[in-house]
Amino acid sequence: MDVKTIAVMGAGTMGHGIAEVSAIAGFEVYLRDINQQILMRAIDNIKWSLEKLHEKGQLSEDPNQVLARIHATLDISEAVRGADFMIEAAFEDIDVKRQIFTEADKYAPPHAILATNTSSLPISEIAGFTSRPQAVIGMQGISQTS
């Protein structure tokens, strides 16, 4: 499977970090959150980070070109409808994850892989919220502080 578009559910520290590195790697990214203020703060943080990386010579591409690959949205259907890969980075709350995975399963293409970033909840339980448990994986990211 060729991954071109990534949907990130949750624009907090982990989610916006995943969106940033995905865009740097050249993917189209849809960053979704349920809170407009958190979403806009995430975009501001990503922009700041990209500019710093560029200033330090760690990012050769124009930060605005990278940022243009990140599409912020409150709408889960918009975020996942063209996604090849979805990464959920929301609170460690099974009800929150149930809502995300149920909705993502409804709107994501049949070939899409759905990933959870959980560190404490059973992945098999999360997979059970979908009609495609075989396409649900666990993926733990690391949020660097420097």
Predicted segments — roles?
Residues G26, L67-R69, H111, P133-V136:
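A generic structural signal for alpha->beta connector loops
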Residues M1-K4, Q65-A68, L74, R81, ...:
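Structured loop/turn residues at beta-strand edges in well-structured enzyme cores
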